[in-house]
């Protein structure tokens, strides 16, 4: 089938845009990309027009005035004047002064984050300020006339050390398909920071973040509405899958609607998603005095406005699934200003150790250093993988763990060694739930379509038919592999892990991290040294819990064979690391809480959610922000659905919050057998089913 699709694509690519539009029966537009048109034709042909007709919409919007949810240039300039004082990068400030300046703005962001979806006492409506105001918190510059953006342009053009507007770029520290990163410092050299540029930011001009809804109903009919990103499934098909992945997730993050159990999500481009992750992680981890993440100082945009006239805005747009409206700005880049990890990456450090350390004479020292790495990473994941957050990094590997020095320590052999702080970085593909909204990466057109084609998300359970405590990535591929031609190079295994609005198994990050560690000779040989001599320690105990004896031997042999063939393992791509697990049909545990017990990692700030708020859905499945009055309610604005209000749906709901019986924290933290888990899920489902009928 894949060959047929490739041939079909090759044939269609020779046709003109105009002819393809005529086949699709849509009006030609310069804003509609030819690849998107071809994708639409391919999907219509191979997956059925009636089915895809409800999934994908490609159309031209009619000309009109500036939409009330879209920035125009006057708004941008006005907003920038308020933010100018919080962009101190060309001033000779100390790091502390810059942090204090930026914290003033972050206080506003944090308060909106805390209040997200709470009920405003003043007007008795849902608070959505974090969504509505998100992009107004950030400076939007212009490559053509703005000093800050001109500096970024200068940095991008130069391959050498260069100074512009009070900032010096020392060197380029990273470059890839998504963008480029510079190491910079103030003129006085008082401190260094990293500027990470990510290209092709799509949605910032729409001001607000879009919300999608997934409704799990106890009965038919299902009324999915792509126009406002509303999908409906039978709860019996899907809810059990969510709870098997993340026991307790529904209890923390579900809402009771007038039609059934409701989950919310917000899908965003790479830069927007990364910026949101930084804000949320900073909020969560600082409460636990955890410093094992890269801190974001600031974020801003630079756009090329050469095609714009003052007072005008883009008037012709395309809407395709997760994509939001494009603008006639030729290119917009997003910039994150982040702390500098002065010791490089864990990947580079392990490579250095591989060249210089003898295991036999340095066993105790290596065990100490490896335990230090594992403790710092695992205690951070333990916090973020609570059911209320359900964090999935989606790209956790040694190259995405940065290292900072903080004084010195004495090793077991008496040697003085730098004290390393290991920091998890690169969150553009990550996902997390906050106050009931799942923030995740939207992917591209192809990944969005694949996500929508899962009519029954229960297929994403991936549970082993032999042992229900394990899942297999091999079970992902049969469906997705038929769609390889439309996902534009995205690794197949990453699609359900990164791009779907329900969380993947939390254990996947631990497995990708451990597998990437094993791809370094020093760690692989250390583990082999311990296994051959039957040495029990924290590292081997973790590996023995994660893998069966047979699977661990398979993984070790696979990597060792690669070493012996003198092939260098490619640790830059997540798919290459995950493929070691997938291609060898390695079973992955769903519940890995025992590995945290090995290091005595416990949480001291657990929160429980004993009530589940109601959210009323309107007649067109939009979220009502307030109670219905005269059969009408105000609704959340959307770039796809430009309305402020909607008719109320005839099926009413109790306005009071509902009790939801969930498994307690002890049940969530320990490994539950399949029968007990099924009973918990059945009880939860029955509670929700009864409450949704009230």
Swiss-Prot record:
It is an enzyme of class 2 (transferase). The keyword Transcription does not apply. GO terms for cellular component: virion component. Keywords: ATP-binding, Kinase, Nucleotide-binding, Serine/threonine-protein kinase, Transferase, Virion. Coiled coil: none annotated. Residues 167-548 form the Protein kinase domain. It comes from the Viruses. ATP binds at residues 173-181, 196. Its EC number is 2.7.11.1. It catalyses: L-seryl-[protein] + ATP = O-phospho-L-seryl-[protein] + ADP + H(+); L-threonyl-[protein] + ATP = O-phospho-L-threonyl-[protein] + ADP + H(+). InterPro entries: Kinase-like_dom_sf (IPR011009), Prot_kinase_dom (IPR000719), Ser/Thr_kinase_AS (IPR008271), Ser_Thr_kinase (IPR053235). This is Putative serine/threonine-protein kinase R679. It comes from Acanthamoeba polyphaga mimivirus.
């Amino acid at each position: 089938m894949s060959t047929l699709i490739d041939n079909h694509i090759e044939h269609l690519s020779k046709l003109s845009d105009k002819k393809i539009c005529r086949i699709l029966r849509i009006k030609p537009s310069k804003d509609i990309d030819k690849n998107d048109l071809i994708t639409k034709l391919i999907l219509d042909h191979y997956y059925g027009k009636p089915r895809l007709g409800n999934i994908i919409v490609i159309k031209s919007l009619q000309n009109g005035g500036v939409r009330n949810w879209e920035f125009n240039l006057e708004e941008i300039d006005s907003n920038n004047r308020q933010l100018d004082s919080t962009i101190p990068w060309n001033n000779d400030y100390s790091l502390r002064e810059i942090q204090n300046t930026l914290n003033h703005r972050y206080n506003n962001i944090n308060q909106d984050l805390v209040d997200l979806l709470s009920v405003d006492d003043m007007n008795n409506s849902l608070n959505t300020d974090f969504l509505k105001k998100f992009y107004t918190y950030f400076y939007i510059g212009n490559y053509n006339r703005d000093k800050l953006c001109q500096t970024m342009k200068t940095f991008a053009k130069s391959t050498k050390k260069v100074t512009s507007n009070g900032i010096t770029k020392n060197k380029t520290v990273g470059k890839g398909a998504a963008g480029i990163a510079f190491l910079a410092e103030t003129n006085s050299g008082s401190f260094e920071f990293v500027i990470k540029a990510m290209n092709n930011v799509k949605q910032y001009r729409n001001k607000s973040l879009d919300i999608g809804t997934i409704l799990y109903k106890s009965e038919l009919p299902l009324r999915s509405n792509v126009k406002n990103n509303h999908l409906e499934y039978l709860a019996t098909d899907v809810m059990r899958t969510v709870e098997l992945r993340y026991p307790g997730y529904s209890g923390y993050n579900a809402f009771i609607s007038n039609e059934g159990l409701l989950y919310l999500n917000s899908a965003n481009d790479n830069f927007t998603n990364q910026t949101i992750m930084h804000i949320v992680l900073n909020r969560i981890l600082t409460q636990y005095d955890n410093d094992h993440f890269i801190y974001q100082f600031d974020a801003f945009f630079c756009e090329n406005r050469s095609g714009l006239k003052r007072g005008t805005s883009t008037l012709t747009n395309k809407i395709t699934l997760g994509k939001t409206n494009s603008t006639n700005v030729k290119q917009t880049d997003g910039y994150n200003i982040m702390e500098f990890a002065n010791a490089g990456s864990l990947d580079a450090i392990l490579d250095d150790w591989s060249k210089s350390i003898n295991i036999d004479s340095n066993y105790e020292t290596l065990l100490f250093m490896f335990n230090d790495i594992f403790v710092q990473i695992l205690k951070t994941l333990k916090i973020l993988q609570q059911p209320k957050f359900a964090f999935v990094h989606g790209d956790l590997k040694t190259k995405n763990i940065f290292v900072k020095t903080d004084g010195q320590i004495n090793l077991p052999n008496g040697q003085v060694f730098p004290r390393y702080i290991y920091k998890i970085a690169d969150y553009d593909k990550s996902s997390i739930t906050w106050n009931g909204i799942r923030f995740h990466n939207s992917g591209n057109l192809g990944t969005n379509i694949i996500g929508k084609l899962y009519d029954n998300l229960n297929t994403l359970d991936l549970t082993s038919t032999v042992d229900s405590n394990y899942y297999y990535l091999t079970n992902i591929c049969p469906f997705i592999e038929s769609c390889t031609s439309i996902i534009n190079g995205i690794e197949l295994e990453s699609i359900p892990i990164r791009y779907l609005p329900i969380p993947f198994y939390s254990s996947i990050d631990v497995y990708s991290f451990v597998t990437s560690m094993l791809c370094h000779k020093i760690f692989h040989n250390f583990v082999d040294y311990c296994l051959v001599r039957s040495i029990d320690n924290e590292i081997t105990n973790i590996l023995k819990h994660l893998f069966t004896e047979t699977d661990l031997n398979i993984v070790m042999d696979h990597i060792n064979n690669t070493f012996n063939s003198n092939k260098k393992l490619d640790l830059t791509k997540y798919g290459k690391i995950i493929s070691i697990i997938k291609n060898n049909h390695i079973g992955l545990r769903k519940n890995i809480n025992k590995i945290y017990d090995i290091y005595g990692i416990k949480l001291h700030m657990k929160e429980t959610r004993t009530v589940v708020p109601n959210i009323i859905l309107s007649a067109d499945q939009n979220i009502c922000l307030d109670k219905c009055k005269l059969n009408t309610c105000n609704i959340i604005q959307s770039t796809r659905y430009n309305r402020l209000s909607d008719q109320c749906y005839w099926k009413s709901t109790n306005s009071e919050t509902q009790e939801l019986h969930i498994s307690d924290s002890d049940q969530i933290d320990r490994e539950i057998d399949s029968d007990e888990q099924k009973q918990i899920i059945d009880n939860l489902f029955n509670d929700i089913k009864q409450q949704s009928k009230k």
